[in-house]
Amino acid sequence: MAGSPFTTALLSAWTLSTVAVGYPNGPWYQTPLGPDVVRDPTRYPGAIEKTVDYVVVGGGASGLTVAARLSEDPSVTVAIVEAGSFYQEVSNASVVPGYAADYLTGHIPPELDWGFNTEPQAGADGRVKHYTNAKTLGGNSAFNLMAYMTTSVGAMQKWAEEVDDDSWTYANVTRYFQKSLNFTGIDPHKRRANSTPELNPADVGYGGPLDVTYPNYAQPFSSWVKKAFDQVGMRPVGGFMSGELFGSSWVLDTINHTDGQRASSAKTFLEPILHRRENLFLYNRTLAERVLFDADRTATGVQASRGKTVFNLTATKEVVLTAGGLMTPQLLQVSGVGNAALLQELRIPVVLDAPQVGQQMEDHISFGVAHRVDVETNSALKYAGPRQHAVEEFNEAQAGILSSPGPDFGGFADIPSELRNFSASTHADLAGLPKDWPEGFFISFPVDVGFPQDGYNYAMIVCTLMTPMSRGHISIRSPSMHDRPVIDPRWLTSTSDVEIAVAAVRRIRQYLQMPVLERNVLVGGEVAPGPEVQTFAEIHDYLKKNFNSMSHPACTCRMGKKGDPDAVVDPKGRVFGVKNLRIADASVFRFLPPGLPLGVVYMVAEKIADDIKHDQKHGAGEEGLRTEF
C-alpha cells in the first residue's frame, strides 16, 4: 500500500508496542487522595496475612463493584487484592476526560499498564502488538473512552438461551444495568443546544454509585456527522440505553457531573466507602500469585505478594476472580485449573483438567477513514494557544474540549446491500446472530491518533466491528503471575471479519461523501487510507497495518450450562469442578455482545454479587460443583 505521511503517523500511533513515560501536555488538575488515605494502615494492611469472608482478586470495574456490594453488610469482611494503586498518584491522564483517547496512542504511564504484548498476529502482517491492560484501581474503567451503554434485547435473549437461564434475558438484567447508575442531565449553559440528546428517563438509573452524563462539550465535527447520518436515514435512538441499538445517538459517558472528572470504578464504587467501612480491606500494590485449594478442590484463599513478601489471604466463604479477560484465565492456569498437559509441562500441580480455560477469546477492533476538517477537533491540543485555553476552560468551569473524551456521537448499522459482496461463510456467520445485532458501530472520532502537526484540524469516522468471529486464546508460559501471559487474539483471521471490515471502510467513505459533510466540513481529499486505496486487497492491507484493538478481551472463562464443553463457569459465575470459586468479570461473557461492553461489565458484576449474597443466605445448590467436562 502506498503510504502518505499521515498514514505513517497513524500506523506508528495505533500500533505502538511500548508505552510513553508520561503525559506532557496535561492541565495539572490533580486530586490525589492524600496521605490520610494512602498511608492508613487499617485500610491498607500491607503484606499482612488476614482471614476474611471474601477475597476479591482484581480492583477494576467488576472487582470494585463486587467488593462494594458484598461489604454493604457490615458483618461481612472483604479483601480486595490489586496489583496497582490509585492512578491519581501517577498522572491526571485518567482524570481529565479529554485525555481518554491518548491511551490509544500509547500515552500510558508504565506504572499504570502491564506492558503486555501479543504473539505475532497473522491478521496484522505478523506484527506483535501492544495490548493495553490497566494496572491500577479502576482497571480499564480508568483507561477507556468512557462510553456507557447497554446491549440489545436479542443478544441477551441469545445469552439466556445458551446458558439455559432466563435470569439473563434483557428484561431480567435491566435492573442490574440501572442499579449501578446515577444519571445526571446536561448543563444547558455549557452544552450547545443543537447537541441536546434525547433519552427516556426510564432507561437509566438514579442514585447508584456510577455517575453517567453527557459531557459539557459537544464536538463540532460530531454535530455534522449527525447531519450526515440523518441524510442516509439513520434514525435517532435514545442513548443506546433501551435494548435497541440500531440508529444514532449522542453517547453517555462515565463522567462526574459536578467536577467534570472521569467516573472510574475507583472514584465511584471504592473511594466513597473506603474510610467508612471497617469491614473492607484494600491490598493495593499486591499481586495475587495463585488461588489456594484444599484436597477437596475447595478454594480457601489466595497467595499474594507485595514486593518480596509472600503471604496468604484466607477466604472463609468464597474467592471471587475479577482480574479481567486476560489475567483471570492466567491466574486460573497458574493455580492448577487449566489444560492438564500444559500444566504438567510447566510443573504446576493439576487441581482440575479444564482445557477450555483461556479459550474462545473475543475482542473488538476499530479502524477509520481520516480527513482534514474545517472545525476544531482535539488535534488542536497539539498547539500551545488552543491547549492553554482548553486547560483554563476545564479548570475553571469543567467545560470546553477537555471536558469530553472526544468520540461523543455514533450510530449502529448494518452494511448496506450494495456493499454486501460477502462469501457464503460470512452470510452463515451472520445468520447465527439475532436480527437486532448490528454489524458496526460508526463513531465520530475528532481526536488525535497521529495526525500531522501542520496547524490544521483532522478527524475520522471510525468503525468498531460488532460481529467479531475471530477467536483467540490466553495461555501461560510459566508457573508465575510475574511473567506475561501468552496473548493470541488472532484478530482479522476470520473471513467474515475481513469482509465486513473492508465493507465498513467503504461505508465510512459513503458517510463522508454526504453533501452536508463534503460541502461544509471536509477540506481537501481523504488523507487515510487515501484515494489510491480502493480494491479489496488494498483496503485489507490498510486494515492489517492500521486496525486498533479496543482492549475488550472477553469470553476466556466462558459462561455456559451443564454439559457445555466450552464453559468454565455456570450462570452464577461459579467455576465448574471446584468449590467456593467464582468469576465476575468480562471473561465469563457468553459472547461479546453488540454495543461497547462497559455497561455489560458492570451489569454482570452487579448480578453475580447478588447471586453470591443469595447463595450465602439460601444455599449455593450444586450447579457449580460439576467435576467432569
UniProtKB/Swiss-Prot annotation:
Highest taxon above the source species: Eukaryota
Alphabetical UniProt keywords: FAD, Flavoprotein, Glycoprotein, Oxidoreductase, Signal
Top EC category: oxidoreductase
KW Cytoplasm (keyword) present: no
Residues making up the signal peptide according to the UniProt record: 1-22
Positions that bind FAD: 61-62, 82-83, 144-147, 586, 597-598
EC number: 1.1.-.-
Coiled-coil ranges per UniProt: none
SUPFAM superfamilies, alphabetized: FAD-linked reductases, C-terminal domain, FAD/NAD(P)-binding domain
Glycosylation sites: 92, 172, 182, 256, 284, 312, 421
Biological process (GO), any one: secondary metabolite biosynthetic process
Cofactor needs: FAD
Pathway terms, separated by semicolons: Secondary metabolite biosynthesis
Entry similarity comment: Belongs to the GMC oxidoreductase family.
Subunit-level organization: Homodimer.
Role of this protein: The subsequent chain release by Dieckmann condensation (DKC) could be catalyzed by the TE domain present at the C-terminus of pyvA and/or the alpha/beta hydrolase pyvD, installing the tetramic acid moiety.
Protein's recorded name: Dehydrogenase pyvF
Classification lineage: Eukaryota, Fungi, Dikarya, Ascomycota, Pezizomycotina
